[in-house]
Amino acid sequence: MARTTPISRYRNIGIVAHVDAGKTTTTERVLFYTGKSHKMGEVHDGAATTDWMVQEQERGITITSAAITAFWQGSEKQHKDQYRFNVIDTPGHVDFTIEVERSLRVLDGAVVVFCGTSGVEPQSETVWRQANKYGVPRIVYVNKMDRAGANFLRVIAQIKQRLGHTPVPIQLAIGAEDNFQGQIDLMAMEAVYWNDSDKGMVPVRKPIPAELQELADEWRGNMVEAAAEASEELMNKYLEGEELTNEEIKAALRQRTIAGEIVLAVCGSSFKNKGVPLVLDAVIDYLPAPIDIPAIKGSDPDNEEILMERHADDSEPFSALAFKIATDPFVGTLTFVRVYSGVLASGDGVINSVKGKKERVGRMVQMHANAREEIKEVRAGDIAALIGMKDVTTGETLCNADKPIILVRMDFPEPVISVAVEPKTKDDQEKMGIALGKLAQEDPSFRVKTDEETGQTIISGMGELHLDILVDRMRREFNVEANIGKPQVSYRERITKNCEIEGKFVRQSGGRGQFGHCWIRFAPADEGQEGLQFVNEVVGGVVPKEYIPAIQKGIEEQMKNGVVAGYPLIGLKATVFDGSYHDVDSNEMAFKVAASMATKQLAQKGGGELLEPIMAVEVVTPEDYMGDVMGDLNRRRGMILGMEDTVSGKVIRAEVPLGEMFGYATDVRSMSQGRASYSMEFKKYNTAPSHIVETVTKKQG
């Protein structure tokens, strides 16, 4: 089967934003204008097409990123052929940053939505940082221009100041608030208006209003200057006073956007149907096709040192990244993949190169929100869902078994909060186990474990809302009613002293014995190393090299049990430098136990300390309640970092220990008569004060 759309006309994009910037409404309009959905879904009445989980519709926030395929030929059909958009809708709530992170990982470009009134909000910064991390080219869309207090150029200034990027507007707003009418197109130098009769489908172009002509000339000049910086040739032309053609300007802005040097900005009101078609035009004009970005990097499964890459080309060996697992009520498990190279037909065999397991692809579907279309094959650049994968987890690579590769893995954050869950009835025990297993497979930032001493099931995640929603899903999707314990902080531990410790495990009484012996130098890890920093300095084969991995494993396993109060050890440097072995009795198990015994002794010799998670907290409050809010944060052992005025109120930034923040949502509402809001995300681990250490060690007994 030949390719229906050339890869140069693919756009894999995400629509990302802060919670209330109007992202889901924007995605809805994208579907409406691209002709895929005939009734506009509104988040306000819980009917949006991409919010397909019941809780999302109730809470009005988007939790799972649905991948949707749509087509666009231009707002005025200015392109001869259609472009194929794969649009991923992502959550903006900070408890779901993992969802945003994994979507950005597989996108080629993003539309970042800001609210015209509140501008750059705390989580906009989080999302922006994630997009920087993966080098995603982006366009800024300032939405909600019809809202009270909306101001396009103020938001542009905020982006420059708070996000450190220089936005280049290619439009200006005509009017604002109730008087928002449309945009000035700085490329065509025309005013663009929208009709209610066709729900803002086709732009109506007119001359620029006289009172805005001067402003338009000024910003057109800024845009042309940004374009001229793309190359020496254009710069010389510009400096010599020659006019640049619109074609030259467009090509230059596209080049600089894809290189991540600039961010183009447009404006509109998705809810009032004023401007989304021009956002889609900008996606075609300025965001990259899969062939415009560097080849994906990876490594050889047999030797991580050997780096490899795959180009976006059908003739290269097949490779794809599983970026999301979802459980579907009708077909079971859906594995969403981004295909980077090659072709895959249904019925083909592939290998999961991370686990070394073979998989056979059953059916393949492309999603349109929660409707689906069966397809027979996928090619480089496609995003699709595979049905029938047995053992694939988010972030793993599927590839051609003869030419394996492991694509760059995703980083998943460590959970910071845990609660105990138990089923309400004995009969639900097994069902709960299955449900939690499925949820953990879908969401790598959610962990499940059994407490060996109490037998309780402990679930851990990124915040209270994260765990609430997972427990809620367990009830709805798997019919498991569960009781939830009080939230517990996930503490960590580290050592403060350097020490050398001998680990020796010897059993030699009749028959095959055991002999493992190693000397390990322990120290706090180097800056920036969070887990185990393992160094092998054994010389002369006093410990054969095949036993070194067992020593590392022994240390890693013992680190989980901590040295102060049973919490995992982090930031540990362990250097194995000496030891001995026995020709007959030594084996991997014996060295693993010896290393584990040495690590255990850190409790006496390592000067262990308890660490507590510190959260970056931002509270937005009317000025009247500022004193109360700050006083309360101080009482919670918070450190106030700063304050600033915004349209939405005073913004207080602080760092507060997570243990002091439980139930804060209710407290901050009652302090401010429901008018303050807050957001928080994990920042770092800090040494816990003595009274916390005392309480925690007592509790652990």
Swiss-Prot record:
Residues 8-291 form the tr-type G domain. GO terms for cellular component: cytoplasm. It is found in: Cytoplasm. One of its GO terms (biological process) is ribosome disassembly. Keywords: Cytoplasm, Elongation factor, GTP-binding, Nucleotide-binding, Protein biosynthesis. Belongs to the TRAFAC class translation factor GTPase superfamily. Classic translation factor GTPase family. EF-G/EF-2 subfamily. This is Elongation factor G. It comes from Pseudomonas syringae pv. tomato (strain ATCC BAA-871 / DC3000).
